Amino acid sequence: MAATSSSAFLLNPLTSRHRPFKYSPELSSLSLSSRKAAAFDVSSAAFTLKRQSRSDVVCKAVSIKPEAGVEGLNIADNAAQLIGKTPMVYLNNVVKGCVASVAAKLEIMEPCCSVKDRIGYSMITDAEEKGLITPGKSVLVESTSGNTGIGLAFIAASKGYKLILTMPASMSLERRVLLRAFGAELVLTEPAKGMTGAIQKAEEILKKTPNSYMLQQFDNPANPKIHYETTGPEIWEDTRGKIDILVAGIGTGGTITGVGRFIKERKPELKVIGVEPTESAILSGGKPGPHKIQGIGAGFVPKNLDLAIVDEYIAISSEEAIETSKQLALQEGLLVGISSGAAAAAAIQVAKRPENAGKLIAVVFPSFGERYLSTQLFQSIREECEQMQPEL
């Protein structure tokens, strides 16, 4: 296959997961329920047409295998080509009392179930294109709260890189298991030191490891760049430019910076709202501290974060984030992580403001809930299941 840029395969116009929705100006005048019904009718008709004629199906990367005598199949050549083009869905039941519509960008549907799959691919590919790393020779080193590490690990495994990760011991057990399953080496750091401690340990490993290279997700332009090139355009396309407000958690700052910049260039009046933990609300003027919202609230201002892009910060407590995550599963059928709960809680707050009546809010759900089964998010359910006995 011909070489492509780090995001080329992510930007094909249609994918097998991308809804064949055709926007019509007439839809904008309908009520929310009528608009959804109309969109469903159009989508269903388009899908029927697609089934009748499969020759025009385009996936994220159309397979080219001439040596096998088969070309143009709707089959990706490797797992990395499954990244991106994640769907959006309206929230319907947790938004009672809201005057704005809330649509979630489901990054939980990435191949390794988090938004960090995008930057894992982007940072490795960018370093390769610059001649900084070589498969089978270079040792990749990075600090992670888990999801970036997983995104890096599955790409590193497919390309033949050794990967050493540092992670606070407070992160979920599932993260440890997944990282090891992909063959990554894992070094745990003191929970009290947060991501700062993990970064310091990664820097120590970098100094003593030959042929090593640190990807630096908090200070790597390839991070916001991939969101500017892919996530932002996807949200813009799926909302047909009707998005009024963007809500996203702030971890590395890559998602909110890349997406916010792309959309604001096309719609300057877009309002961008960043979400951080109440217990570590440094962007809102607070102090860093321990919290339970894994993936956001690193305790410092990441260099990737463009402060000029963000219009407002909302602090959400760990307890509210956890409870909202639970309600998303129980009421919406969406099993999401704690940071998704935080983002949803913030989006619901914004959607209840009278000045936002009739507006469309897009909120990013970064990761899948199954990665949090050992955390407080599922503690009561886990204890209940552990006590279950077979019926006689």
UniProtKB/Swiss-Prot annotation:
Q: Please give the InterPro entries that the UniProt record associates with this protein.
A: Cys_synth, Cys_Synth/Cystath_Beta-Synth, CysK, P-phosphate_BS, TrpB-like_PALP, TrpB-like_PALP_sf
Q: Name one GO biological process term.
A: cysteine biosynthetic process
Q: In which pathway does it act?
A: Amino-acid biosynthesis; L-cysteine biosynthesis; L-cysteine from L-serine: step 2/2
Q: Which UniProt keywords apply?
A: Acetylation, Amino-acid biosynthesis, Chloroplast, Chromoplast, Cysteine biosynthesis, Plastid, Pyridoxal phosphate, Transferase, Transit peptide
Coiled coil start-end: none
UniProt cofactor(s): pyridoxal 5'-phosphate
GO MF term list: cysteine synthase activity
Q: Where does pyridoxal 5'-phosphate bind?
A: N147, G251, T252, G253, G254, T255, S339
Q: Which chemical reaction does it catalyze?
A: O-acetyl-L-serine + hydrogen sulfide = L-cysteine + acetate
Any idea which residues bear N6-(pyridoxal phosphate)lysine here? Answer: K116
| Top EC class for this record | transferase
Please state where this protein is localized. Plastid, Chloroplast stroma; Plastid, Chromoplast
EC number of this enzyme: 2.5.1.47
In chain numbering, the transit peptide falls at 1-60
Instruction: Please name the PROSITE patterns in this protein's record.
Output: CYS_SYNTHASE
Q: What is the documented function of this protein? A: Acts as a major cysteine synthase.
Q: Which family does it belong to?
A: Belongs to the cysteine synthase/cystathionine beta-synthase family.
What is the name attached to this protein's record? Cysteine synthase, chloroplastic/chromoplastic
